[in-house]
Structure formats: C-alpha cells, structure tokens
Amino acid sequence: MSQKRVSVHALSATVVATLLAVGLTAGLPSPAQAAGTTYFISAAGSDSNSGTSSSTPWKSLAKINATVLKPGDTVSLRRGDTWTGGVVTGQSGTAAAPITLNSYGSGSAPTVTGGKSGNCIRINGDYTIVDGLRGVSCGYAGISITGDHDTVRNSSASNNAVGIKAGSGSDFGKYTGNVLTNNSIMNVLTRGTNCGTAQAVNCNDDSGASGVLINGNDNEFSGNTISGSNAFSYDYARDGSSFEIYNGNRNNIHHNVAVDNNNFSEIGRSTGTADGNTYRYNLVRATCGANCTQAKGLIARGPGTSFGPTNGTVFEFNTVYLNGSQSQAVVCHASCPSSTVIRGNILVGVKNSLWINGSGWTERQNVLNGPVNVVLNSTSTTAPARFLNAPSDLHLTGSSPAIDRAGTSPTAFDLAGVAVPQDGDCNGTAAADSGAYEFDSPNC
C-alpha cells in the first residue's frame, strides 16, 4: 500500500473488494433469486404509469409504499434522482426469494432525504435487501431495519443521528460495503441540572451520532467504512460511535474501517443484555485534532454500572491508533467481566492503551503503546508497534513486534485480504500477527 494518506472512500473500496475476493461475505443472498415483479421509480416518472418498466416508471415514494410487495419483487430507484420523504416496506420475502430495493440507470446513487417519521429507508419485513441506496439528512436514521434476515449493502448515509439502525428484534442481518459519513447529529442533547448530586436531572441522557446503532442480535457487519460520528455533548463533552451496541447480543463486527469517530464501539444494556459481541480485524484511527481528544476504541462494562455487565466480549486482531491527549484504546470498567477477551491487538492510546479492572478476564498477545493499569500477560509487549507510516498507513514493517505474536486466528484473511497466518519472521513456522494487518515477508 502507498505510504501516502489513503482516503476513507479508497479504504472502503479496498476492504469491500477484499471481502468479496476472499469470500468473507459468506451468508449474503445470491444475486440469483426467484423471479418477481420489478417496480421502477424515477423523479421524472408518473404515478399514472404502469411502473413495471424503466420507460414507464412511477414518480413518488408514496406509490411504492402503498404497493403490497411479494417475495421476489424488486423496487428499483433511478440513479441520479432525489426524493424527499421515505421508503417504508412492511412485507417479507423469503430466503430463496427476498424483496430487493436497488437502483437502475447511471450516475450517483438514488438519494432519499427528509425522512418519514425520521427515517429515509425503513424495512419492517424479513428477508429484504437494500442495495446501493443513500439516506441523507433524514431526521433520525438513514436506513432503519426492524425485520430479520435483512441485508444492507453498498449503501450510504450521512448527516443523520444514526447512519444504519438494526433495531430491537432485528436479528440475523448482513451489513456490508456501506459508507457512513458524518452522522454527527445528537437526537438527544439536553443541558443537565444539579449534575453530580442526588437531584441530578438530564445529566446522562445525551445520545446520537452513531454510524451504526445495534439493538438486535446475531447480525454481521463487515467491509463498512464509518467516519465522522463525533459530536458535542453536554453530558460527555464529545459523543458518537462507529458501532453502538445497546441491548444487542452475539453481533459479529469484522473487517471494518473506522476513522475519526469519538468511539469505535461502546457496549451497554438496560433491561436486556449485551453479551457475546465479537470484533476482529477492524482498523480504528482517530487523529482529527480537538474533536478526537478523548477518542476511545472499545468501551465494555462490568456489573458495577447500570449499563453493564457486557459479558463475553471478544476483541482481537484489531489495530487501534488514537493520538488525542485523553484517548484510550480499550476500556473495560466497573469490574470488567471475567469472560472478556482482549487478544492479539495493537492498541495505541495516549492516556491509556488499556484500562481494565475486575479479575479473570483474558489479556494476551497484544502490542500496547501507551499507559496500562494492569500487569500484562507475558505474551504481550509494550515495544513500539513499528507501523509503515503512521497514522496514514498502519501496515507493519518487518521489525514490528506484532509479527507472529498471536499464534492462531479464527479468520483466514486479514483486513487487506492477506492469508493468515504468514511466516512473517521467517523462522519456518507461520503464526498470526497481532493487529488488523498480517505481514507477508518478501524474504521467505
């Protein structure tokens, strides 16, 4: 990779191409599906048209919202067009014949703005695919999913409180190849009173600025690029997250790129649970100056807070690079659960590379650059990570202590599509590297 700064969009294209090439998007519905009716929508169309060909498209989103879609049906929006309002579907497809929302023609992605009840695209049914659409300035969420087994891919959202929402009860979804940019609006932003006292009011209620908000279970997020989820907060000074998990379980977050967000992922719960969430081969970088001063990578919790515990969190083979004066790469507080695993990462933070309390958790095979508050496992190191050209290129050099440090990996490819493991130190035995990138030595 070039040592010049790589743009967020270039990173996104690279990651998606890699995932497709190496088959890490397994589980996505096949392009081949049972035939149904295709409905065409164009800003230049007419609702008196048949809507069933690109030469006779409908015009309004209301027309499609009133249509009873059946398994195998497709709604195709013309590229280059913009609609104000919202797309809402409530019918379900099947595994063999999903309902699909996509685009036709040439030009920029079809855009929905303004929102309907705060959401530009809302999918309430099961087995529905959203492919290549855009939600901008929607009021709340660019794309909101409440059904099961839904797919959102190759889509984008910006200037919302939430880019993509996997809502409560939205399970077994696939989210890949999406670009979520500057979703930095706070949907709750109130100045608290009597904060720090028993009479405190509105001192812990600010929320928003999420690239992805996950309230569902067993969803997969891969190949996405999230940037600019970072906003002012009365309660927290700054707020925002690439992947916010609240009452969501067993979600798999892997091979994503997160740039200049306030947090990479914060996990919490209220009356539900937030257990068994995993993170692998993600690149997290926050170097945006004042707005990234307090950036964090992962925030997990124990039972000593009303938002915890977050049991069974696994965070491994990630590269986190934060340079703000109060930045912390991984935090697990309030008696961090013993089921937490922090393994095989490169963690760079100025205030803390790792802050963790409680007992019984697993920390090993990490490269940590920045203060830590615990005695590290003997398999971890605080030696400089030795990146190729930090912060713009966080691949490893041949002298990095991350090479061959992590033993085995459950994943066959790194963030760039390099096979794992490689014999990076040329000692005759291949082993996985710590961090999101595997070093493939040219010398052996």
Regions found by a protein language model. Give the residues of each.
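Predominantly extracellular beta-rich ligand-binding scaffolds that present long acidic/polar faces
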Residues: 85-90, 96, 252-258, 271, ...
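Acidic Gly/Asp/Thr-rich repetitive segments characteristic of extracellular carbohydrate-active
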Residues: 43-78, 82-84, 416, 433
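Surface-exposed loop/turn segments connecting beta-strands in extracellular beta-rich domains
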Residues: 85-86, 104, 115, 136-139, ...
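C-terminal accessory segments
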Residues: 376-441
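Extracellular beta-strand/beta-solenoid scaffold signature
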Residues: 88-89, 114-121, 137-144, 159-170, ...
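Secretory targeting and sorting signals
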Residues: 2-34
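Right-handed parallel beta-helix/beta-spiral solenoid domain characteristic of secreted/periplasmic
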Residues: 43, 57-58, 74-82, 90-141, ...
